[in-house]
Amino acid sequence: MDQLNNREQQEFQQLVEQKQMKDFMRLYSSLVQRCFTDCVNDFTSKALSSREESCLEKCSEKFLKHSERVGQRFQEQNAALMQKR
């Protein structure tokens, strides 16, 4: 990164930010699809039932905790690789 000039660093930073946004949107979309499919099954009303609401809360919590844990493991692996260098 030190070898890049200011313009190149800005371009690189912009690419990183775009990738992060794309990854976030993919995660969000996956969360919505999975939890909706698992929890919402009564289409007779446009309002969620209390059961569906509870299921959606638990599903999203579980999904986000899992994603956080995976991220932590990646950070640990990355740190271990950096120490080996």
Curated annotation (Swiss-Prot):
A motif (Twin CX3C motif) lies at residues 35-59. GO terms for molecular function: metal ion binding; protein transporter activity; unfolded protein binding. Heterohexamer; composed of 3 copies of TIM9 and 3 copies of TIM10, named soluble 70 kDa complex. Associates with the TIM22 complex, whose core is composed of TIM22 and TIM54. Interacts with the transmembrane regions of multi-pass transmembrane proteins in transit. Disulfide bonds join C35-C59, C39-C55. Belongs to the small Tim family. It is found in: Mitochondrion inner membrane. This is Mitochondrial import inner membrane translocase subunit TIM9. GO terms for biological process: protein insertion into mitochondrial inner membrane. InterPro entries: Mito_inner_translocase_sub (IPR050673), Tim10-like (IPR004217), Tim10-like_dom_sf (IPR035427). Keywords: Chaperone, Disulfide bond, Membrane, Metal-binding, Mitochondrion, Mitochondrion inner membrane, Protein transport, Translocation, Transport, Zinc. GO terms for cellular component: mitochondrial intermembrane space protein transporter complex; TIM22 mitochondrial import inner membrane insertion complex. It comes from the Eukaryota. Mitochondrial intermembrane chaperone that participates in the import and insertion of multi-pass transmembrane proteins into the mitochondrial inner membrane. Also required for the transfer of beta-barrel precursors from the TOM complex to the sorting and assembly machinery (SAM complex) of the outer membrane. Acts as a chaperone-like protein that protects the hydrophobic precursors from aggregation and guide them through the mitochondrial intermembrane space. The twin CX3C motif contains 4 conserved Cys residues that form 2 disulfide bonds in the mitochondrial intermembrane space. However, during the transit of TIM9 from cytoplasm into mitochondrion, the Cys residues probably coordinate zinc, thereby preventing folding and allowing its transfer across mitochondrial outer membrane. It is a peripheral membrane protein.
